[in-house]
Amino acid sequence: MAGVDEVGRGALFGPVVAAAVLVPIEAINQLQALGVKDSKQLSPQHRSQLAQALPDYVHSYGISFADVPTINRVNIRQASLLAMERAVQKLPVMPAWVLVDGRDTLPHIAMAQMAVTGGDRKSLLISAASILAKVWRDTLITRLAERFPGYDLASNKGYGTAKHRQGLRQYGATPLHRPLFCRKIIENPD
Protein backbone atom coordinates (compact mmCIF):
# COMPACT_ATOMS: atom_id res chain seq x y z
CA MET A 1 0.00 0.00 0.00
CA ALA A 2 1.19 3.53 -0.72
CA GLY A 3 0.46 7.01 0.53
CA VAL A 4 0.94 10.24 -1.41
CA ASP A 5 0.88 13.88 -0.34
CA GLU A 6 1.88 17.27 -1.67
CA VAL A 7 3.39 20.35 -0.07
CA GLY A 8 3.67 23.93 -1.18
CA ARG A 9 0.16 24.27 -2.49
CA GLY A 10 -0.42 27.59 -0.73
CA ALA A 11 3.05 29.04 -1.28
CA LEU A 12 3.72 32.17 -3.30
CA PHE A 13 7.09 30.92 -4.54
CA GLY A 14 8.41 27.71 -6.03
CA PRO A 15 7.00 24.39 -7.13
CA VAL A 16 4.40 22.19 -5.54
CA VAL A 17 6.20 19.00 -4.45
CA ALA A 18 4.76 15.55 -3.87
CA ALA A 19 6.07 12.33 -2.41
CA ALA A 20 4.69 8.81 -2.56
CA VAL A 21 5.80 6.05 -0.21
CA LEU A 22 5.25 2.34 -0.60
CA VAL A 23 5.21 0.74 2.82
CA PRO A 24 5.03 -2.96 3.68
CA ILE A 25 2.15 -3.68 6.05
CA GLU A 26 4.56 -5.02 8.66
CA ALA A 27 6.41 -1.67 8.76
CA ILE A 28 3.40 0.48 9.63
CA ASN A 29 3.84 -0.02 13.38
CA GLN A 30 7.50 0.94 13.00
CA LEU A 31 6.48 4.22 11.39
CA GLN A 32 4.30 4.96 14.39
CA ALA A 33 7.13 4.07 16.78
CA LEU A 34 9.44 6.44 14.88
CA GLY A 35 7.02 9.28 15.55
CA VAL A 36 5.78 9.71 11.99
CA LYS A 37 2.89 12.16 11.83
CA ASP A 38 1.73 15.11 9.76
CA SER A 39 4.82 17.08 8.72
CA LYS A 40 3.18 20.33 9.83
CA GLN A 41 3.09 19.00 13.41
CA LEU A 42 6.84 18.34 13.51
CA SER A 43 9.73 20.69 14.13
CA PRO A 44 12.06 21.21 11.16
CA GLN A 45 14.79 19.25 12.95
CA HIS A 46 12.51 16.30 13.72
CA ARG A 47 11.19 16.31 10.12
CA SER A 48 14.75 16.17 8.80
CA GLN A 49 15.65 13.30 11.14
CA LEU A 50 12.58 11.35 10.06
CA ALA A 51 13.24 12.06 6.37
CA GLN A 52 16.70 10.54 6.79
CA ALA A 53 15.32 7.50 8.65
CA LEU A 54 12.25 6.79 6.51
CA PRO A 55 14.05 5.14 3.57
CA ASP A 56 15.08 2.34 5.96
CA TYR A 57 11.43 1.61 6.79
CA VAL A 58 9.63 2.03 3.48
CA HIS A 59 9.85 -0.30 0.51
CA SER A 60 10.43 2.65 -1.81
CA TYR A 61 9.49 6.25 -2.40
CA GLY A 62 9.19 8.73 -5.23
CA ILE A 63 9.39 12.51 -5.17
CA SER A 64 8.27 14.79 -7.95
CA PHE A 65 6.98 18.30 -8.51
CA ALA A 66 5.05 20.64 -10.74
CA ASP A 67 6.93 23.83 -11.53
CA VAL A 68 5.64 27.40 -11.59
CA PRO A 69 4.89 27.46 -15.37
CA THR A 70 2.81 24.30 -14.92
CA ILE A 71 0.98 25.81 -11.94
CA ASN A 72 0.24 28.91 -14.03
CA ARG A 73 -0.96 26.85 -16.98
CA VAL A 74 -3.21 24.28 -15.27
CA ASN A 75 -3.96 25.85 -11.81
CA ILE A 76 -2.65 24.81 -8.41
CA ARG A 77 -5.18 22.03 -7.83
CA GLN A 78 -4.38 20.29 -11.11
CA ALA A 79 -0.64 20.89 -10.62
CA SER A 80 -0.86 19.27 -7.17
CA LEU A 81 -2.57 16.22 -8.64
CA LEU A 82 0.01 16.06 -11.43
CA ALA A 83 2.89 16.19 -8.93
CA MET A 84 1.28 13.40 -6.90
CA GLU A 85 0.72 11.29 -10.03
CA ARG A 86 4.36 11.74 -11.01
CA ALA A 87 5.51 10.75 -7.51
CA VAL A 88 3.43 7.55 -7.64
CA GLN A 89 4.79 6.78 -11.12
CA LYS A 90 8.34 7.02 -9.74
CA LEU A 91 7.72 4.08 -7.42
CA PRO A 92 9.63 1.09 -8.81
CA VAL A 93 6.76 -1.22 -7.86
CA MET A 94 3.17 -0.14 -8.37
CA PRO A 95 1.13 -0.53 -5.20
CA ALA A 96 -2.18 -2.34 -5.00
CA TRP A 97 -3.71 0.69 -3.26
CA VAL A 98 -2.88 4.37 -2.99
CA LEU A 99 -4.12 6.62 -0.20
CA VAL A 100 -4.23 10.17 -1.55
CA ASP A 101 -4.25 13.16 0.77
CA GLY A 102 -7.14 15.47 -0.01
CA ARG A 103 -10.53 15.20 -1.61
CA ASP A 104 -9.41 14.06 -5.06
CA THR A 105 -8.06 10.79 -6.37
CA LEU A 106 -5.42 10.84 -9.09
CA PRO A 107 -7.22 10.91 -12.44
CA HIS A 108 -4.43 9.45 -14.57
CA ILE A 109 -3.39 6.61 -12.26
CA ALA A 110 -5.16 3.34 -13.03
CA MET A 111 -5.13 1.60 -9.66
CA ALA A 112 -7.28 1.40 -6.58
CA GLN A 113 -7.23 4.71 -4.71
CA MET A 114 -8.89 6.41 -1.82
CA ALA A 115 -8.95 10.14 -1.24
CA VAL A 116 -8.51 10.91 2.46
CA THR A 117 -9.40 14.43 3.51
CA GLY A 118 -6.91 15.43 6.20
CA GLY A 119 -5.00 12.28 5.36
CA ASP A 120 -1.68 13.63 6.62
CA ARG A 121 -3.25 13.54 10.10
CA LYS A 122 -5.12 10.24 9.63
CA SER A 123 -2.74 7.93 7.77
CA LEU A 124 0.86 7.07 8.63
CA LEU A 125 1.49 6.36 4.94
CA ILE A 126 0.37 9.82 3.91
CA SER A 127 2.22 11.35 6.87
CA ALA A 128 5.45 9.66 5.78
CA ALA A 129 4.95 11.04 2.27
CA SER A 130 4.26 14.51 3.68
CA ILE A 131 7.54 14.44 5.62
CA LEU A 132 9.62 13.48 2.58
CA ALA A 133 7.92 16.06 0.37
CA LYS A 134 8.21 18.84 2.96
CA VAL A 135 11.91 18.26 3.64
CA TRP A 136 12.68 18.03 -0.09
CA ARG A 137 10.81 21.27 -0.85
CA ASP A 138 12.19 23.14 2.16
CA THR A 139 15.73 22.18 1.15
CA LEU A 140 15.12 23.40 -2.39
CA ILE A 141 13.64 26.72 -1.25
CA THR A 142 16.48 27.28 1.22
CA ARG A 143 18.98 26.83 -1.62
CA LEU A 144 17.01 29.17 -3.87
CA ALA A 145 16.89 31.80 -1.11
CA GLU A 146 20.54 32.58 -1.81
CA ARG A 147 19.68 33.49 -5.41
CA PHE A 148 16.69 35.61 -4.40
CA PRO A 149 17.52 37.68 -1.31
CA GLY A 150 14.98 40.16 -0.05
CA TYR A 151 12.06 37.74 0.30
CA ASP A 152 13.15 35.91 3.49
CA LEU A 153 12.68 32.60 1.67
CA ALA A 154 15.04 30.68 3.96
CA SER A 155 12.63 31.36 6.81
CA ASN A 156 9.22 31.36 5.13
CA LYS A 157 9.91 28.60 2.57
CA GLY A 158 7.98 30.54 -0.05
CA TYR A 159 4.81 31.14 1.95
CA GLY A 160 3.20 34.57 2.25
CA THR A 161 4.64 35.94 5.47
CA ALA A 162 4.80 39.68 6.12
CA LYS A 163 8.49 39.81 5.13
CA HIS A 164 7.82 37.89 1.93
CA ARG A 165 4.94 40.18 0.98
CA GLN A 166 7.11 43.20 1.78
CA GLY A 167 9.83 41.82 -0.53
CA LEU A 168 7.28 41.35 -3.31
CA ARG A 169 6.12 44.95 -2.98
CA GLN A 170 9.69 46.24 -2.84
CA TYR A 171 11.40 44.07 -5.49
CA GLY A 172 8.55 42.61 -7.52
CA ALA A 173 8.14 38.94 -8.38
CA THR A 174 10.95 36.64 -9.47
CA PRO A 175 10.50 34.04 -12.23
CA LEU A 176 9.84 31.47 -9.49
CA HIS A 177 6.99 33.41 -7.92
CA ARG A 178 3.48 32.34 -8.85
CA PRO A 179 2.05 35.36 -10.69
CA LEU A 180 -1.59 34.60 -9.95
CA PHE A 181 -0.78 34.24 -6.26
CA CYS A 182 1.33 37.41 -6.08
CA ARG A 183 -0.56 39.86 -8.27
CA LYS A 184 -2.87 41.19 -5.54
CA ILE A 185 0.03 41.63 -3.11
CA ILE A 186 2.05 43.63 -5.62
CA GLU A 187 -0.89 45.67 -6.96
CA ASN A 188 -2.51 46.39 -3.57
CA PRO A 189 0.21 47.24 -1.06
CA ASP A 190 -2.24 47.51 1.86
Curated annotation (Swiss-Prot):
The reaction(s) this protein catalyses: Endonucleolytic cleavage to 5'-phosphomonoester
GO molecular-function terms, A-Z: manganese ion binding; RNA binding; RNA-DNA hybrid ribonuclease activity
UniProt keyword terms in alphabetical order: Cytoplasm, Endonuclease, Hydrolase, Manganese, Metal-binding, Nuclease
Subcellular location: Cytoplasm
Domain (RNase H type-2): residue spans on this chain: 1-190
Cited InterPro entries: RNase_HII, RNase_HII/HIII, RNase_HII/HIII_dom, RNaseH-like_sf, RNaseH_sf
SUPFAM superfamilies (UniProt xref): Ribonuclease H-like
Primary localization: cytoplasm
Recorded superkingdom: Bacteria
Binding annotation for a divalent metal cation: D5, E6, D101
EC number: 3.1.26.4
One GO BP: mismatch repair
Co-factor binding details: Manganese or magnesium. Binds 1 divalent metal ion per monomer in the absence of substrate. May bind a second metal ion after substrate binding.
A Pfam cross-reference name: RNase_HII
GO cellular component, as recorded: cytoplasm; ribonuclease H2 complex
Cofactor(s), names only, from the UniProt record: Mn(2+); Mg(2+)
PANTHER family hit by this protein: RIBONUCLEASE H2 SUBUNIT A (PTHR10954), RIBONUCLEASE HII (PTHR10954:SF18)
Protein family per UniProt: Belongs to the RNase HII family.
Role description: Endonuclease that specifically degrades the RNA of RNA-DNA hybrids.
Name of this chain's protein: Ribonuclease HII
Species classification: Bacteria, Bacillati, Cyanobacteriota, Cyanophyceae, Synechococcales
Gene this protein is translated from: rnhB
